[in-house]
Amino acid sequence: DKKEMENLLKSKGWDTDTAKRVMRFDSRGNIMINGTKGVQFIQESSDSILSGFEEVMKEGPLAKEQVRNCKFTFTHFVPHEDTAHRGLSQLSPASRRACMAAMLKANPILLEPMLGIEVRVPQDMIGNVATVLSGKRGKVLDMQQKGVTSIITGEIPASETFDISEVMRGQTAGKAMWNTHFKAWTPMPKSIQANLIADTRKRKGLSPEPPTADEFIDRSEEHTSELQSLAYLVCRLLLEKK
């Protein structure tokens, strides 16, 4: 419900005008805002414009993975006068190119799922558990003592947990008991991001290097691409950490 969404955003500190202009707010926190003023045919074109936006949110430019927590402001629209040239097949590709270029200009990053972990071990095994977590890019956040048992609370990237049972039991002589739960999406360390992007793209049959913003921006004076002859979209993207 549009009114309900407006009230929710206002309760989170958004100003009334911006909250009213939200065109789409998807389940992964991606937002498209109508920032245009006095432009014709916006209402009848919105579904086609949002189609391109949604396509990019499903397969982002870095590795064709889902996008999270991005806000786009749709700032300009020069529609074709002929209704036949303002359809889905014309506007959706133009919207997609604008969103891809905006994302790449904003220097997007990869996010990875971070898990919370609680480990119960004898007190003399605390160091062993800390070693396991640190060796898997995790860390200890808190420790409590209950009788002879130490309860260690920490976090660990989901991608590092595939052999956690074998490693944890090996380090604690089988005395550790633990459970994990999803905690948050967190930025992936830059030291491993580039290699992961390249590996993921290769696995999907893509070139190892992600595209650049220039590949989606028409810089010719005549604007001979579909961005001129059909529609011209300019989007500004801000990456926001929740």
Task: Map each language-model feature to its residues.
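Single conserved hydrophobic/aromatic residue that forms the stacking wall/gate
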Residues: 222-242
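Accessory interaction regions appended to the cores of large information-processing enzymes
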Residues: 1-221, 225
